[in-house]
From Swiss-Prot:
InterPro entries: Ribosom_uL1_bac-type, Ribosomal_uL1, Ribosomal_uL1-like, Ribosomal_uL1/biogenesis, Ribosomal_uL1_3-a/b-sand, Ribosomal_uL1_CS
Keywords, alphabetical: Repressor, Ribonucleoprotein, Ribosomal protein, RNA-binding, rRNA-binding, Translation regulation, tRNA-binding
Family per similarity comment: Belongs to the universal ribosomal protein uL1 family.
Gene Ontology process terms (BP): regulation of translation; translation
Function: Binds directly to 23S rRNA. The L1 stalk is quite mobile in the ribosome, and is involved in E site tRNA release. Protein L1 is also a translational repressor protein, it controls the translation of the L11 operon by binding to its mRNA.
Highest taxon, organism lineage: Bacteria
GO molecular function, one term: rRNA binding
Subunit architecture: Part of the 50S ribosomal subunit.
Record flagged with keyword rRNA-binding: yes
GO terms under cellular component: large ribosomal subunit
Keyword Repressor listed: yes
The protein's name in its UniProt record: Large ribosomal subunit protein uL1
Length: 226
């Protein structure tokens, strides 16, 4: 722990807590602050001026990043066309049998993609899936008539995003060995998407602040790009 503490102290000194870093400089610096022995995740937190008690100010959707974020996910496809879903890259495929397996405690997956047909049966598992963030939703295109295209998109790196109860959006943008320009491009794609989703009822400042961090590392603040 002493070595970790010393390393943390050293990298923290690299960051000016009072500075808003231009986005390119921010990513170049944050990659230098990783303190883990493994390749760390580079994450972004966007704090928004939202009242999440109002449904219209709860942001949720999916983003297809321009560059890979270096994370693979286990997809469960609940569909009638199991063969095509499997060929598209789904890790697990099935129909009502998989829903029954979930009901009995099987949760060895990260994402469910399904068609509207199965939502009646899945909806009965709302308490089990909803609390874990696993319930499919049309907003994230995990409930769709084109299950195959959705599987391919998520396997290529498409990610769900949603505001937490404080109005923050947290996502991984890549890893410390990802090219800086790719991290910047992914960040800009997310920021532009968030800007486009500004609720009409929000007054004044919308994006309050942006911060970057690595796994277990310190954070730094980013100047909002024009």
């Amino acid at each position: 722990m002493k070595k970790l503490s010393k390393r943390m102290q050293a990298v923290t000194k690299l960051i000016d807590k009072n500075k808003l870093y231009p986005i390119q400089e921010a990513f170049e610096l944050i990659k230098k602050t990783a303190i883990t022995k493994f390749v760390s995740s580079v994450d972004i937190a966007v704090s928004l001026n939202l009242d999440t008690t109002k449904a219209e100010q709860q942001l949720r959707g999916a983003i297809a990043f321009p560059f890979s974020i270096g994370k693979s996910i286990r997809i469960l496809a609940i569909t009638d066309d199991e063969k095509k879903a499997s060929e598209a890259g789904a890790d697990f495929v099935g129909g009502l049998d998989k829903i029954e397996a979930i009901k009995n405690g099987w949760l060895d997956f990260d994402l469910i993609i399904t068609s509207p047909k199965f939502m009646g049966a899945l909806g009965k598992l709302g308490k089990l899936l909803g609390t874990r963030g696993l319930m499919p939703n049309p907003k994230t295109e995990t409930v769709t008539d084109d299950v195959v295209s959705a599987i391919k998109a998520y396997k290529k790196g498409k990610k769900e995003y949603r505001t937490d109860s404080f109005g923050n959006i947290h996502l991984s943008l890549g890893k410390t060995d990802t090219k800086t320009e790719h991290l910047v491009a992914n960040a800009m794609a997310l920021i532009d998407l968030i800007k486009s989703k500004r609720p009409s009822t929000v007054k004044g400042t919308y994006i309050k602040n942006i911060a970057l961090t690595t796994t277990m590392g310190p954070s730094l603040k980013v100047k909002l790009p024009d």
